[in-house]
Amino acid sequence: MATSLRLLDAGPGSLRRWIPTCFAALLLLPPRPNLGYNEDHAEPVCGAPWWSDSLEERHHWPWEVSLQIENEHVCGGALIDQSWVVSAAHCIQGNKEYLVMLGSSTLQPSGSPWALKIPVGDIIMHPKYWGQNFIRSDIALLCLETPVTFNKYIQPICLPEHNFNLKVGMKCWVTGWGQAKQHPSAKLTRSLELWEAEVSIVDNKNCDRVFHKKTFYPQVIPLIRKNMICTTNHRENPCYGDPGGPLACEVHGRWILAGIFSWEKACTKAPNLSVYTRIDKYTGWIKEQVSRGARSGRCRTSCLLFLPWLLQLPVSPGPPHPFLFLLCLC
């Protein structure tokens, strides 16, 4: 017991030299279900979707999820790990029982062998979430009751590093079962099939000026803050995104979760301005909550989520960092 206490009190130590020992120990453990990819032999990496050769499935978004109440779609979300989904905090409606549907691009996946519906076991709202008027810190983590097995149709998207270089004019993609108008006088209708739209990153200051014109807030009060992203598109029906749905940006062949759809100016005409929670401002909080969930036993997590962080720890003599033991058990 004394040894355990001493190790827990140790600071960042020689983690890198302990990693081979940890993985050697992992090889001696019996296999655990629902870990890694299945017989499709896809590599267990984030943000690397399988692209079909068929035109109909050219753009495939395997991290897209549907957050549902009583089997009715209410919001989108993004899978970041075998047990965790990121969505918008304003999607959470009190003590409801939520399901997450994965592995399907349609809201009616009858007969699909890949579609899964998994109950949400725990929900973590960001402590600074503000849902009045212009929403702030609009992010929530959903822990699945059962970890998923990754395959061609269910894969995680990568979390961005802190201060992710998101440039104005950069092209990204928003996906969801959003609403659209077939003509100006028509009612908004939800699509049963997953839609996608390419959007451009807009300068936050310019976006802020546009939103201020529609409100009585003085200019000195920023509506679009540093922890938000603003985008625009030029499609006829701009409302492709779902609240909580992902804004995905491709960087060097890897798809990054840049944002989570939060709110927009209007859903009537293009070009349309949409506002997202900027994920790189919350990456540290996400990893902290995932780590706590793993330690408490509520949610298992994948070691891959923490691997970039582990490799950045300094090398120094002494006992290993206690997080290494969490890595060995995850």
UniProtKB/Swiss-Prot annotation:
Keyword terms, alphabetized: Disulfide bond, Glycoprotein, Secreted, Signal
Glycosylation sites: 272
Molecular function per GO: serine-type endopeptidase activity
Annotated Pfam families: Trypsin
Disulfide bonds: 75-91, 172-249, 207-230, 239-267
Family: Belongs to the peptidase S1 family.
Listed name of the protein: Inactive serine protease 45
Organism: Rattus norvegicus
Lineage per the UniProt record: Eukaryota, Metazoa, Chordata, Craniata, Vertebrata
Gene: Prss45
